[in-house]
């Protein structure tokens, strides 16, 4: 049904039109009454005559009007949509934006919408505008703040800030803009309040000095590790303190290399320090915090790289410029890697020098040799070359093996008299022989009979090659035998290892042996398997990973709480053993202090005093028999060539 012209339609027609025609001014022509929303004094100008569409339908103007209405509606819809996109983020558009940032190609081939979980933005450096005004997080540099002083509309930031109020559970975001009158230290406290303080400091360091901080230092995970050289970078130092730092640091250090740079955070001080004594990171941090008057967290503290040539060249080159203040003697690790003369002196590692060091210091353990030789790297060129080598473990093993070969050959060529003299020369203290004699008398042992048996014992006479010290517990048997064994450099064997075929192997590398605390089971084992060993005749000993070794058993001492001479089951051992009984408890002068001290110095004096009674060869006779008296050398000497 066709609608009538004008505004006199039914109520349903007004509802279909949207209801906005009801606010039109209504005039009753019969009585000339004016509606309340229209001015009475206003004159009619005729400008609103075209407001009512009274055209005749079908005149041909419907199509342009409909097209204009469609274009207007599209423009309005686009404007509203743009406004919605600015103030209310669409879930679909946000998800597609994130997926676009992660991988545009992957988003282009996706067939459906993926999960709406939050994803990290990979290619966006600045956070997107949320649409709720110019809210801003804490900035990292003052340049970023000055660039955002005004928003897109040209209004100040303070006029554009919006505070979130209500129960949405989100914290208010405010703008932190440093004022022009704020000092450098105050700015640092604000600027360094970031999520990763250390990363911020490292980034600022590289911008100022042009090199990465960790390219010059090595990292100590523990803050308790001590070191004499430290690299310190301090941020936010006052200008007056930075100027006087060279004088302030001198009482604490032997060497200082100080560089000062000016930045937006204040003065940045970069130092290479050598302290008077070794300090750990905590001590250095407290010391520098006290001198510079800054928090400890505003400093980077690590030890320098001692074997890095680029790092040494950096310190050497910057020390020559006018931007550094240096005092003290340059550390040797910088000199060694930068000066031409020191570089030419670097030589290749020589194993013979290491073997000679192990031989001279009587080192036959790999761990001891590796540790002690590495400590000589600062003063010995060969030790420094050893540390620079990639075959340190192989060199240590080979050096110890060669040292053992030399020691074994030297020991086998010596007689017992020569060996006692050799061991006595290693003792520099002066002792007294009387405590040994007094201890034997305290135990009821006649000194003359002991010397007679001891003389045959040292010579290795068959059937007299073993001395047994018998007695109850706590009488000093092990103390007496251990002191003699330590002086003569002997070996200890234990019956606990008798299940192994190699438990007698230590006897092949010693001049004297000790079997401590022999039990009845041990005596039964000796009676069955080791009779020839006690006789002093040649026996065959099995060695691990080596062929059987035939040797004459060295003199053997045995301590026991069981008297083997009183048991009939061991009657075949009676002629092979010389037994001394210790009856009395071991005497003490005070708790932990023996009344009769027996040590290497006392044993040295004892042998010197009893040398003739023990029928030992004199040193003069040994030299006459072909001993040159010169120390062993495994390092080739330099030949003096005439021109």
UniProtKB/Swiss-Prot annotation:
Q: What is its EC number?
A: 5.6.2.4
Please describe the post-translational modifications of this protein. Answer: Phosphorylated.
InterPro entries (alphabetical): Helicase_SF3_DNA-vir (IPR014015), P-loop_NTPase (IPR027417), PPV_DNA_helicase_E1_C (IPR001177), PPV_DNA_helicase_E1_N (IPR014000), PPV_E1_DBD (IPR046832), PPV_E1_DBD_sf (IPR046935), Rep_E1_papillomaV (IPR016393), Znf_lg_T-Ag_D1_dom_sf (IPR037102)
User: Subunit notes for this chain?
Assistant: Can form hexamers. Interacts with E2 protein; this interaction increases E1 DNA binding specificity. Interacts with host DNA polymerase subunit POLA2. Interacts with host single stranded DNA-binding protein RPA1. Interacts with host TOP1; this interaction stimulates the enzymatic activity of TOP1.
This chain belongs to the protein called Replication protein E1
* Pfam families (UniProt xref): PPV_E1_C, PPV_E1_DBD, PPV_E1_N
Ranges where the SF3 helicase domain occurs:
445-595
Q: Which organism is it from?
A: Human papillomavirus type 2a
- Going by the record, the broad EC class of this enzyme is isomerase
Q: Does the keyword Nucleotide-binding apply?
A: yes
Function description: ATP-dependent DNA 3'-5' helicase required for initiation of viral DNA replication. It forms a complex with the viral E2 protein. The E1-E2 complex binds to the replication origin which contains binding sites for both proteins. During the initial step, a dimer of E1 interacts with a dimer of protein E2 leading to a complex that binds the viral origin of replication with high specificity. Then, a second dimer of E1 displaces the E2 dimer in an ATP-dependent manner to form the E1 tetramer.
Residue location of crosslink Glycyl lysine isopeptide (Lys-Gly) (interchain with G-Cter in SUMO): 552
> Which cysteine pairs make disulfide bonds?
none
* Intracellular or extracellular location(s): Host nucleus
One GO molecular function term?
A: DNA helicase activity
Residue ranges, annotated region (Disordered): 28-58, 119-138, 143-181, 617-643
Q: Provide the alphabetized UniProt keywords.
A: ATP-binding, DNA replication, DNA-binding, Early protein, Helicase, Host nucleus, Hydrolase, Isomerase, Isopeptide bond, Nucleotide-binding, Phosphoprotein, Ubl conjugation
- Keyword Nucleotide-binding in the entry? The reply is yes
State the span of motif (Nuclear localization signal): 84-86
Phylogenetic classification of the source organism: Viruses, Monodnaviria, Shotokuvirae, Cossaviricota, Papovaviricetes
């Amino acid at each position: 049904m066709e609608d009538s012209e004008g505004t006199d339609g039914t109520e349903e027609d007004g509802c279909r039109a949207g209801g906005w025609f009801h606010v039109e001014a209504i005039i009753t022509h019969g009585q000339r009454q004016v509606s309340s929303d229209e001015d009475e004094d206003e004159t009619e100008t005729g400008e609103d005559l075209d407001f009512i569409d009274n055209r005749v339908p079908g005149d041909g103007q419907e199509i342009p009007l409909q097209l204009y209405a469609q274009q207007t509606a599209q423009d309005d819809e686009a404007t509203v949509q743009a406004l919605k996109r600015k103030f209310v983020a669409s879930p679909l558009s946000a998800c597609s934006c994130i997926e676009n940032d992660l991988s545009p190609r992957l988003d282009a081939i996706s067939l459906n919408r993926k999960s709406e979980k939050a994803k990290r933005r990979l290619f966006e450096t600045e956070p997107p505008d949320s649409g709720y005004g110019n809210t801003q997080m804490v900035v990292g540099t003052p340049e970023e703040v000055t660039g955002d002083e005004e928003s897109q509309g040209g209004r100040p930031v303070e006029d554009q800030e919006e505070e979130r109020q209500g129960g949405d559970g989100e914290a208010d975001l405010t703008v932190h803009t440093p004022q022009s009158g704020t000092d450098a230290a105050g700015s640092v406290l604000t600027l360094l309040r970031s999520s990763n303080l250390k990363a911020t400091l490292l980034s600022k360091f590289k911008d100022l000095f042009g090199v990465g901080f960790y390219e010059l230092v090595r990292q100590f995970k523990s803050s308790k590790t001590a070191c004499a050289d430290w690299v310190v970078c301090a941020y936010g130092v006052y200008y007056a303190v930075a100027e006087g730092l060279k004088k302030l640091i001198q009482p604490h250090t032997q060497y200082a290399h100080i560089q000062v740079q000016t930045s937006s955070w204040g003065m940045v001080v970069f130092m290479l320090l050598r302290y008077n004594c070794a300090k750990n990171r905590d001590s250095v941090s407290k010391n520098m915090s006290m001198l510079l008057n800054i928090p400890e967290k505003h400093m980077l503290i690590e030890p320098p790289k001692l074997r890095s040539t680029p790092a040494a060249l950096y310190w050497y080159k910057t020390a020559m410029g006018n931007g550094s203040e240096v005092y003290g003697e340059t550390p040797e690790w910088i000199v060694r890697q930068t000066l031409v003369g020191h570089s030419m002196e670097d030589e290749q590692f020589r194993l013979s020098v290491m073997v000679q060091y192990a031989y001279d210091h009587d080192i036959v353990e790999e761990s001891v040799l590796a540790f002690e030789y590495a400590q000589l790297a600062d003063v010995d060129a060969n030790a420094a070359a050893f540390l620079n080598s990639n075959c340190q473990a192989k060199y240590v093993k080979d050096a110890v093996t060669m040292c053992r070969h030399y020691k074994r050959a030297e020991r086998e060529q010596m007689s017992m008299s020569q060996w006692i003299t050799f061991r006595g020369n290693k003792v520099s203290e002066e002792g007294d022989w009387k405590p040994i004699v007094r201890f034997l008398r305290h135990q009821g042992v006649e000194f003359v009979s002991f010397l007679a048996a001891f003389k045959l014992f040292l010579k290795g006479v068959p059937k007299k090659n073993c001395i047994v010290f018998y007695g109850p517990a706590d009488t000093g048997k092990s103390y007496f035998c251990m002191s003699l064994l330590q002086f003569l450099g002997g070996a200890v064997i234990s019956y606990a290892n008798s299940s192994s075929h190699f438990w007698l192997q230590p006897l092949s590398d010693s001049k004297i042996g000790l079997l401590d605390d022999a039990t009845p089971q041990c005596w039964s084992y000796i009676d069955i398997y080791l009779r020839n060993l006690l006789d002093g005749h040649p026996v065959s000993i099995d060695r691990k990973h080596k062929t059987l070794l035939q040797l004459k058993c060295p003199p053997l001492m045995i301590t026991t709480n069981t008297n083997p001479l009183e048991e009939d089951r061991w009657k075949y051992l009676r002629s092979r053993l010389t037994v001394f009984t210790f009856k009395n408890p071991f005497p003490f002068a005070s708790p932990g202090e023996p009344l009769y001290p027996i040590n290497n110095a006392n044993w040295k004096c004892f042998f010197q005093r009893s040398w003739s009674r023990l029928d030992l060869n004199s040193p003069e006779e040994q030299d006459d028999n072909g001993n040159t008296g010169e120390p062993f050398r495994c390092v080739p000497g330099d030949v003096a060539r005439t021109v």
